[in-house]
Amino acid sequence: MKKYFTKQALKDGFNIMKAAGSGFSNDMALKFSASLAYYTVFSLAPLLLLMISLAGLFLGREAIQGELFKEINGFVGNDAAKQIQDMIARLELTGKSTTSVIIGSITLVIGATTVFGEIQESINIIWQVKAKPKKAWLKMLKDRLLSGSLIISLGFLLLVSLILNGALSALNDRLRTYLPDITVFIFYVINIVLSFAVITTLFAVIFKVLPDAKIAWKDVRSGAIFTSILFMLGRFLIGIYVESSANSSTYGAAGSLIAILLWVYYTAAILYFGAEFTKAYVDFKGKRIEPADYAVHVKQMEVERDVKKLPKKIDKETGKSIESEVKK
């Protein structure tokens, strides 16, 4: 443990953070965050509905929905959480005709997977990789299937999280009668550790699976752990800011929507900074994030060129071209 707090280790960590911050600025990651927040407005309800449906196959749908919205309420406030709940209720396919269910299901899947496509494209730019343009429809199909697998993973993580929380809650109630003070602290720490593990797993899957790149698991692990720490620290501050902004009379009736947009915007900024940190960490190790077999590496260069002649102009009267030199 001491090796992480030596003078050299702290210096290396500072250099990695400096490179990550520089990349975050140069790649205009905040624009990606704003773009993701916009897409999430349309994808959030379908995504949550699919997650609830998948987890509901194993546990009670109402129990899962209740726990999920309790977590969302902690992130964006009661009004915004209620608005998300209403959006999901309108997307329910029960009681509709077969044709409506089929069309609605397709629309639901496309809407839910769009947000992952946006994340993939943004991380590709940050990691300087790009899929080859050939067979674009195959690439699109693959991306949709990949996004679908991530939704299944999210549903599984939600299920595991709820099961563990339920088991811990039952154990907490039993032990509290014997050790009331110590039990509260112990289970508070356990809850933080479990939340950290789930969030780290989610970020690791995103960094490893979504981009069109090859990256070792140990490099993914370092980036995911850093991003999770950043997320856990930022979640509390973001929650306070979003809540105070949403309750402001400045936004009026749109306060709930603004709360959702702000929360996704700042969460996306943390995700993309984590991607920049992962790239900076890999570069520091003397390696490079390689493109996948179906992708290529993209290099950006700034080129200055002296122009000796201006573009040709056409004389309106004679119809002849006029060449002119640049005055020095």
Give, region by region, the residue ranges found by the protein language model.
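Membrane-embedded alpha-helices and immediately adjacent juxtamembrane helical segments
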Residues: M1-K328
